[in-house]
Amino acid sequence: MNEEQFVNIDLDDDNVCSVCKLGTEKETLSFCHICFELNIEGVPKSDLLHTRSLRGHRDCFEKFHLIANQDCPRTKLSRSPYAEVKSILSKKINWIIQYAQNKDIDSDTESSKTSQHPLFNLRHQTDRKLLPQFDSPVPRYSAKWIDGNSGSISNCSQSLLEQSEPTDFRLGMLQETGATFCCSSVLWSNRSQAQKTEKAESDSLTSPHRRHPHYSREELNMMTTGELKQLNEKLLKQIQDVFEELTQQVQEKDSLASELNVRHIAIEQLLKNCSKLPCLQMGRAGMKSNVPI
């Protein structure tokens, strides 16, 4: 019967480098001198890469620390460009949704923390008016009163335009009940007449029918030619002021209607494209991004 042959295994690994796992002479192995210097500088032992019990080559420990200190963050490796594009697209669509819902973007704390990307530098401008589109009809009104004779301004009208007193010839002047016209060269109302005008406006709002000053045929016949001319110019000036005021109101109404139409179109397009973007979810508060970080 053959004798059993046993293989002797040396469990003494004092001559094996803990980094490269190669056997060498025991005299050439030592502990990590870099961790030893860091411990002397105040770094706790729990943050060190090697303990005092590990033995290895000096070059192996230096290469180990060199590889460990390389600038290779995990976030840069695990984050894909597609995820970054989805994040930017989600934030941009959320901004469009907030703009369409007429929300205040400047008060949003989340938007103030975002990066200075060109997509996020846009802000809602309340004073901006939308330009007419290519298929929009041309307005049938003018912003200025068109004079039929296209002649020079008369002396009386020029004196009226050069007055420094505040002008109150608006819609309220046509509603004033006891308005009278003076025959002097200055036809603008003074401060006391302005207060009467405001009082007449408040009274006219409560009355069922608004009234404006009128003259009978006898009163007009008793006036001189100069008085009639001044009265005519004053009435023309009132008509021009009312016309420009109504024109401004119509323009503001058209601008608001155009802006509302653009918002409705934006919301409709976003709802149609919602199914094509799996990174977005529809909720009661609007579109919410669902991008994994």
Curated annotation (Swiss-Prot):
Coiled coil found in the keyword field = yes
| Superkingdom, natural source | Eukaryota
Q: Write down the InterPro entries for this protein, in alphabetical order.
A: EURL_prot
- Expressed in which tissues: Expressed in undifferentiated retina and lens.
Which keywords does this Swiss-Prot/TrEMBL entry list?
Coiled coil, Differentiation, Neurogenesis
Q: Which GO terms describe its biological process?
A: cerebral cortex neuron differentiation; positive regulation of dendritic spine development
Query: Coiled coil where?
Result: 226-260
The function of this protein is: Plays a role in cortical progenitor cell proliferation and differentiation. May promote dendritic spine development of post-migratory cortical projection neurons by modulating the beta-catenin signaling pathway.
What family is reported?
Belongs to the EURL family.
What is the protein name given in its UniProt record?
A: Protein EURL
